[in-house]
Amino acid sequence: MDDEEPERAERAAAPAASDPAGGLDYSRLYEYRFKDVDQDARQRVWNEIARYLWERLGRPRRVLDPAGGRGEFVNAVPAEERWLVDVVDYPERNTDPAVRIVIGDLFDIDLPDAYFDAVFASNLLEHFRSPEDVARFLDRMRATIAPGGVLALMGPNYKYCADEYFDCADHLLALTHLSVQEHLFAAGYHVREVVPRFLPFSFRSRLPASPALTRLYLRMPALWRIQGKQFLILANP
């Protein structure tokens, strides 16, 4: 898995993606960050991760990715209904036509209430400007989750990747699995599962972009405790 991440870093709640008045130009930032990334290889990695997570989340029927980027997760997750939200409208996004795409600020767009069986947010929280923004996001997602649904959060765990955590220009908040649990509790969620070390911070230089090796990694939690630098947390509203 020599492609960047699965820390995708395309964010749904950022300022205007290509408007200099909005501050950081996210379109140009991600163009630079992923200029040498093989998107096909990256999708192959996510094919395995998405299927694994879908099973772990209880095979949800309706899934929302609120920071969907180029669609790697929603392309692969075998849910009946898939939604992608992102602030960046990537011209090269090659998303399954069955995926419903919503472009815009996550806090401004319309989403159905009590609708999704699962919300999966990957590498999003660290891009918010303040703990208050994290709280707003958790409240926003709680409103969209159906009764019995689940919120899954994945992101770099500062406790295990402090040296490289701020190598990304848009990483603003230092978060660990412990601080995220506090955020969830404060927002009224019930934390049901915590994996402090799940995926590597970046798969670039760790493993080749091989579906077989990705599957092997996902089936061997002992490897997570060595390579894992991202947390995975599941919580119910």
Place the predicted regions along the sequence by residue.
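Conserved N-terminal segment of class I S-adenosyl-L-methionine
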Residues: M1-A114, A118-S122, V134, L138, ...
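S-adenosyl-L-methionine-dependent methyltransferase catalytic module, highlighting the catalytic core
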Residues: R28, Y32, D36-R44, F107, ...
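Active-site beta-alpha loop architecture of Rossmann-like, nucleotide-cofactor-dependent enzymes
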Residues: E126
